Amino acid sequence: MPKLGMQSIRRRQLIDATLEAINEVGMHDATIAQIARRAGVSTGIISHYFRDKNGLLEATMRDITSQLRDAVLNRLHALPQGSAERRLQAIVGGNFDETQVSSAAMKAWLAFWASSMHQPMLYRLQQVSSRRLLSNLVSEFRRELPRQQAQEAGYGLAALIDGLWLRAALSGKPLDKPLAHSLTRHFITQHLPTD
């Protein structure tokens, strides 16, 4: 009989091992055997919990998107009465949270984005994440701007966040958070009405 709570421990081990493998060798070269070895389990355990490599990759992407959602929501919940500007900066902060900009997370996101063009489940997860970001941004801009302007500003800020993130990911260097926050703050203040 399995130990109580072992499933969540094993799943976490396997997701962490998957992120490590993607970080070191890339998603396509990360094998079930390598991931199992990193996690200190047999390959059968992966099949037991995730069916196959695609199931494990999907669970890993769900985990990263869940961490992103939590990073944003934790910051927003800390500002229930915050101004639109502060709440927009909180959304930006969540997107640049360490869980999203570590080397392993950045490489995993890049691999998932590339794979999502060919795998319907990964595509769906990517679209949910993308729509959530845009919806959050537009909702906050909408507090201060007419609908069309809020949509345009939200789209622009989402593109800026993604662009800054992508440039850092492709550079192989850590994201320059002070610069990223400065640029996004400037964008936000340029699009919100002045008092």
From Swiss-Prot:
Coiled coil: none annotated. One of its GO terms (biological process) is negative regulation of DNA-templated transcription. Keywords: DNA-binding, Repressor, Transcription, Transcription regulation. Residues 31-50 bind DNA. Residues 8-68 form the HTH tetR-type domain. PROSITE patterns: HTH_TETR_1, HTH_TETR_2. It comes from the Bacteria. One of its GO terms (molecular function) is transcription cis-regulatory region binding. Pfam families: TetR_C_6, TetR_N. Pathway: Amine and polyamine biosynthesis; betaine biosynthesis via choline pathway [regulation]. Repressor involved in the biosynthesis of the osmoprotectant glycine betaine. It represses transcription of the choline transporter BetT and the genes of BetAB involved in the synthesis of glycine betaine. This is HTH-type transcriptional regulator BetI. It comes from Escherichia coli O127:H6 (strain E2348/69 / EPEC).
